[in-house]
């Protein structure tokens, strides 16, 4: 073995070390872990994870799990950071390419539009874990994940993002810049889908709360921190190096992931184990997934995965309203990328660097919201009797967040008069950041608990919907703020969140009844009862 291979085998299971280790485990399992079947073509051995199986990612050590979680979460943060860091380079790019503010902000919109395409394409290829719940891996729905897993999309997407972002840094004109940012955003959709699935691979549902909470904050903290860092970077090193900085950030995370993050997707690991066992003793082994899914054509599987999210979105009222609520919030976050430069750079004469600091209030609110969400999960939800936990048990933080959202937005809108100190409006934007976290996280968990076996499709639909809104909102921000004024322009999305505010209250009180009347929610509940032997 080479020196490099020796070093790799001592690390936290890099990609190169996975296969040999799995073969060794597989060979041991031939004698120590009997499988159902006879080992013939007609009656093959059925390979599934054994109790305390070290090849099962859920049985890996806590340090290793959290190390991998931090890598995939930083990947999401890097992508969303890149989406917004561009937004504070307006003056320099508009001057260099002689373009309007609307055409400039299109560079943000197309990047986020790529996120919308991401779940639609990457989701069927790398389903965000299973749609049959961890309660029974044998019930996994067939997707093309068994062909690609999570590792190959990670390598492909990060490589492509680095290439397109590097190209954008050298763009000779605005058309090239916009096209390359769109392509970078499309490949950036892969980490948004794949990272959450990797966390679900590592942690069983009862232990997943904290990891998913931190992961779910990354898509909102990234867009807020992007302008803060990008503003000063633009001022001192120019907009091209802002794109270059983002390229390096994504590239470093991608390389770290290639080195340290092994394949975590259960069906792929079981298939590899079955192949290794077959080679080891010449008998026939297949994974439990192969046994249960039958011989389905990839085209059939891919088509179903593309259609199901839209069926759930438009046929399930819970999914539609929850997705609309989250989309309005997400769109508003990206609206502020165009609004803040108008409010502080244009009207108060701030430089790009100091203009980016206007996002500090929202950032503080997001961090406080994250702390509150962790406290609520550990101090309230986890102390509930497991037999009495319902999907609605997730919603109390969303009630607080639903109130905080319009308060923060109206306060920000009407404290931006020149006669009022700038610090007031920035401080009062914190409730908006607080509300973003406390509405999004509980609603995501509510949808997962309500739709269990269909959770991946539900979340894919919600992700596409909110990304479209995130792409559209910035396009009319400049006209809206210049025509209506900064006070009323900010009040419009505030009124939208006010209209949506009753949703968490209503679902907390009547959600169980509504779920019984929704076809797929009721079906998911029945499937879970059968899987759990109830």
From Swiss-Prot:
GO terms for cellular component: plasma membrane. Signal peptide: none annotated. Induction: The promoter contains putative CRE1 binding motifs 5'-SYGGRG-3' and expression is differentially regulated in light and darkness by CRE1. Photoreceptors BLR1 and BLR2 negatively regulate the expression, while ENV1 exerts positive regulation. Glycans are attached at residues 29, 36. Coiled coil: none annotated. Keywords: Glycoprotein, Membrane, Transmembrane, Transmembrane helix, Transport. The chain crosses the membrane at residues 66-86, 103-123, 160-180, 182-202, 209-229, 241-261, 318-338, 354-374, 395-415, 424-444, 456-476, 486-506. Disruption phenotype: Abolishes production of trichodimerol and dihydrotrichotetronin in darkness. Also impacts production of paracelsin in a light dependent manner, with decreased paracelsin levels in light, but likely in an indirect way. CDD domains: MFS_Tpo1_MDR_like. Belongs to the major facilitator superfamily. Sugar transporter (TC 2.A.1.1) family. Major facilitator-type transporter; part of the gene cluster that mediates the biosynthesis of sorbicillinoids, a diverse group of yellow secondary metabolites that restrict growth of competing pathogenic fungi but not of bacteria. This is Major facilitator-type transporter sor6. It comes from Hypocrea jecorina (strain QM6a) (Trichoderma reesei). The gene is sor6.
């Amino acid at each position: 073995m080479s020196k490099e291979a020796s070093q790799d085998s001592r690390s936290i299971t890099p990609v190169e070390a996975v296969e040999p280790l799995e073969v060794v485990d597989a060979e041991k399992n031939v004698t120590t872990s009997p499988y159902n079947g006879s080992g013939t073509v007609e009656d093959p051995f059925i390979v599934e994870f054994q109790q305390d199986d070290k090849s099962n990612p859920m049985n890996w050590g806590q340090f290793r799990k959290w190390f991998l979680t931090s890598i995939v979460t930083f990947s999401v943060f890097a992508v969303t950071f890149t989406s917004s860091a561009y937004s504070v380079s307006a003056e320099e790019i508009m001057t260099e390419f002689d373009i309007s503010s609307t055409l400039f902000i299109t560079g943000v919109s197309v990047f986020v539009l790529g996120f919308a395409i991401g779940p639609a394409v990457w989701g069927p290829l790398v389903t965000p874990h299973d749609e049959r719940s961890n309660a029974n891996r044998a019930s996994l729905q067939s997707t093309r994940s068994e062909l690609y897993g999570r590792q190959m999309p990670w390598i492909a997407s990060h490589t492509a993002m680095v290439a397109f972002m590097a190209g954008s840094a050298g763009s000779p004109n605005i058309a090239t810049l916009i096209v390359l940012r769109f392509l970078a955003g499309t490949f950036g959709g892969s980490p948004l889908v794949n990272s959450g699935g990797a966390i679900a691979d590592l942690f069983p549902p009862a232990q997943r709360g904290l990891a998913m909470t931190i992961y779910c904050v990354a898509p909102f903290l990234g867009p807020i921190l992007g302008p803060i860092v990008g503003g000063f970077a633009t001022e001192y090193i120019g907009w091209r190096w802002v794109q270059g900085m983002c390229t390096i950030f994504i590239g470093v995370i991608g390389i770290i992931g290639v080195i340290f993050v092994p394949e975590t997707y259960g069906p792929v690991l079981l298939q590899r184990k079955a192949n290794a066992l077959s080679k080891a003793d010449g008998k026939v082994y297949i994974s439990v997934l192969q046994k249960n899914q039958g011989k389905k054509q990839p085209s059939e599987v891919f088509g179903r995965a593309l259609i199901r999210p839209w069926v759930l979105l438009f046929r399930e009222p819970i999914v539609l309203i929850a997705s609309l609520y989250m989309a309005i919030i997400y769109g508003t976050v990206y609206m502020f990328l165009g609004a803040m430069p108008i409010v502080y750079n244009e009207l108060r004469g701030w430089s790009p660097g100091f203009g980016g600091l206007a996002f500090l209030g929202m950032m503080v609110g997001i961090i406080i919201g994250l702390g509150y969400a962790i406290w609520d999960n550990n101090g309230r939800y986890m102390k509930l009797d497991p037999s009495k936990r319902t999907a609605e048990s997730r919603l109390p933080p969303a009630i607080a967040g639903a109130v905080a959202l319009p308060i923060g937005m109206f306060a920000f809108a009407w404290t931006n008069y020149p006669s009022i100190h700038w610090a007031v409006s920035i401080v009062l934007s914190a409730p908006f950041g607080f509300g973003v976290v406390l509405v999004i996280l509980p609603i995501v968990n509510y949808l997962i608990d309500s739709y269990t076996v269909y959770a991946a499709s539900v979340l894919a639909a919600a992700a596409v919907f909110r990304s479209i809104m995130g792409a559209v909102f910035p396009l009319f921000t400049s006209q809206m703020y210049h025509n209506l004024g900064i006070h009323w322009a900010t009040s419009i999305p505030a009124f939208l969140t006010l209209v949506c505010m009753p949703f968490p209250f209503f679902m907390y009180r009547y959600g169980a009844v509504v779920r019984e009347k929704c076809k797929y929610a009721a079906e998911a509940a029945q499937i879970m009862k059968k899987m759990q032997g109830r």
